[in-house]
């Protein structure tokens, strides 16, 4: 079993439970399926357990993986014991899905070895969805034909965003970004999507369809405090902007984006819960 440097050798769930975060084994108010495309599975699991488990909304979480990909950094037996194949998604009775980013953004979509699985999922999905980073770029490409383009330099750091009036994010907030590619705001607007939050330096952070059913998020509100510190120590060639106090890597970075992610994920879960139970009432 592998996880990123500095992280304990525990599953994401075990690590969250050790810190007092509890999840429903079954029959939570909401059931969320997370398509985890990142190489270090346990770290991403923990990120989402920590984010989704902090509210007074009981959530059951399951993780899924594309069958056409062999993950090099996680033992196959761990995947088999803790994940469902993507082909099972429609049989799991989810209320919503989340698709993570993936370290394949510099590849053409068609050259990603699990692209057909991802493309078919996005095309057929009828559930509320959060698409994050590469997952957002993939969904925008499949659904609207929006191309991604490569940045001159990797975007790494914490950036300030402004919001356009909407029920999910408000005011100005900080959020992490870590990516080499981007979508243009012009293309997103021309597709008829809502731009909910954006940054002069980091571009569009969050967009949605007109009904707030699908969200496209270019950054990483789910990141824990140390994630960009790990990326900096790994790469060394790029310093994360607005992250370390006084740009000193020896100082503990503040969690400047915590209030933003708390607001968004609480409102998103509440929105899904409201829609779910209003649909149940309508059927009675």
Swiss-Prot record:
The record marks 178 as: Important for substrate specificity. Keywords: Acyltransferase, Amino-acid biosynthesis, Cytoplasm, Methionine biosynthesis, Plasmid, Transferase. The keyword Transferase applies. Substrate binds at residues 154, 178, 234. Its main location: cytoplasm. GO terms for biological process: methionine biosynthetic process. Its EC number is 2.3.1.31. GO terms for molecular function: homoserine O-acetyltransferase activity; homoserine O-succinyltransferase activity. It catalyses: L-homoserine + acetyl-CoA = O-acetyl-L-homoserine + CoA. Pathway: Amino-acid biosynthesis; L-methionine biosynthesis via de novo pathway; O-acetyl-L-homoserine from L-homoserine: step 1/1. It holds the Pfam family HTS. One of its GO terms (cellular component) is cytoplasm. It is found in: Cytoplasm. The active site is at residues 133, 220, 222. The record marks 105 as: Important for acyl-CoA specificity. Belongs to the MetA family. Transfers an acetyl group from acetyl-CoA to L-homoserine, forming acetyl-L-homoserine. This is Homoserine O-acetyltransferase 2. It comes from Ilyobacter polytropus (strain ATCC 51220 / DSM 2926 / LMG 16218 / CuHBu1).
């Amino acid at each position: 079993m592998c996880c990123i440097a500095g992280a304990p050798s525990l599953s994401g769930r075990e690590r969250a439970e050790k810190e007092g975060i509890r999840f429903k084994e079954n029959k939570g108010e909401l059931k969320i399926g997370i398509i985890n495309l990142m190489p270090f599975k346990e770290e991403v699991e923990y990120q989402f357990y920590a984010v989704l488990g902090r509210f007074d909304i009981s959530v059951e979480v399951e993780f899924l993986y594309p069958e056409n990909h062999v993950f090099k950094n996680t033992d196959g037996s761990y995947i088999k014991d803790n994940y469902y194949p993507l082909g099972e998604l429609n049989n799991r009775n989810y209320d919503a899905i989340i698709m993570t980013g993936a370290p394949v953004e510099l590849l053409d979509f068609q050259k990603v070895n699990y692209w057909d699985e991802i493309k078919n999922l996005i095309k057929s999905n009828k559930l509320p969805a959060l698409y994050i980073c590469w997952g957002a770029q993939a969904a925008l490409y499949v659904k609207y034909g929006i191309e991604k383009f490569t940045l001159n330099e990797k975007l790494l750091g914490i950036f300030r965003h402004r919001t356009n009036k909407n029920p999910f994010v408000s005011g100005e907030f900080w959020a992490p970004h870590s990516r080499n590619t981007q979508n243009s705001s012009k293309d997103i607007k021309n597709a008829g999507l809502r731009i909910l939050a954006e940054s002069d330096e980091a571009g569009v952070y969050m967009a949605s369809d007109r009904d707030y059913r699908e969200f496209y998020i270019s950054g990483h509100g789910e990141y824990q405090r140390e994630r960009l510190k790990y990326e900096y120590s790994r790469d060394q060639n790029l310093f994360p902007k607005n992250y370390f106090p006084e740009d000193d890597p020896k100082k503990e970075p503040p969690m400047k984006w915590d209030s933003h992610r708390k607001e968004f994920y609480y409102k998103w879960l509440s929105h899904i819960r409201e829609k779910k139970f209003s649909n149940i009432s309508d059927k009675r």
